[in-house]
């Protein structure tokens, strides 16, 4: 989705992805995610999924992708980020990813005025975000969700 948005708005993107347990390309193709994509967009999608881990690669002239094969807790970066999409499984499935410590890590990884977005809308998760300094906002949900959450790093 980031690639498609960047392409449409002519943005240059340095996209970093953290995956501890990546979906194999054989499973990704079964999701039929690319059914509405152009042929060129399908090529880019498969190129992203087949890219080597832990190494940046220009997917297109304006889209650099680095996939990090590690746990979020282990991830370190000298760079600060504008946006973090936090798409972990729910707090009931992966409670270790919804703690104050994890939100503190993401807060520290964001630039001032950076944004964290998640499909989760759980009350305790929002309290954890607020506790570490996020300005928390509830938003209308996407992809069939009733509500989602945005955290702003306002310093």
Language-model features and meaning:
Residues 27-78:
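S-adenosyl-L-methionine
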Residues 132-155:
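Core SAM-dependent methyltransferase catalytic element
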Residues 1-46:
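SAM cofactor-binding core of SAM-dependent methyltransferases
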Residues 83-86, 112-120:
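Conserved beta-strand signature within the Rossmann-like core of class I S-adenosyl-L-methionine
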Residues 19-20, 98, 121:
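Short beta->alpha hinge that forms the Motif I/post-I loop of the SAM-binding pocket
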Residues 96-112:
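A short glycine-rich, Lys/Arg-flanked "PGG" loop and its adjoining helix->strand segment in the class I
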Residues 82-96:
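A short SAM/SAH-binding and catalytic strip from SAM-dependent methyltransferases
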């Amino acid at each position: 989705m980031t690639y498609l948005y960047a392409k449409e708005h002519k943005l240059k993107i340095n996209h970093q992805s953290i995956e501890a347990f990546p979906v194999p390309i054989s499973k990704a193709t079964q999701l039929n995610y690319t059914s509405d994509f152009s042929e060129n967009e399908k090529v880019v999608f498969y190129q992203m999924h087949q890219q080597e881990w832990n190494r940046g690669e220009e997917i297109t002239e304006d889209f650099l992708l680095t996939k990090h094969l590690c746990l979020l807790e282990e991830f370190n970066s000298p760079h600060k980020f504008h946006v973090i999409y936090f798409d972990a499984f729910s707090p009931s499935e992966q409670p270790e990813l919804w703690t104050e410590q994890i939100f503190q890590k993401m807060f520290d990884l964001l630039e001032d005025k950076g944004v964290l977005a998640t499909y989760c809308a759980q009350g305790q998760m929002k309290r954890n975000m607020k506790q570490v300094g996020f300005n928390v906002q509830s938003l209308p949900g996407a992809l069939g969700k009733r509500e989602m959450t945005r955290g702003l790093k306002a310093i």
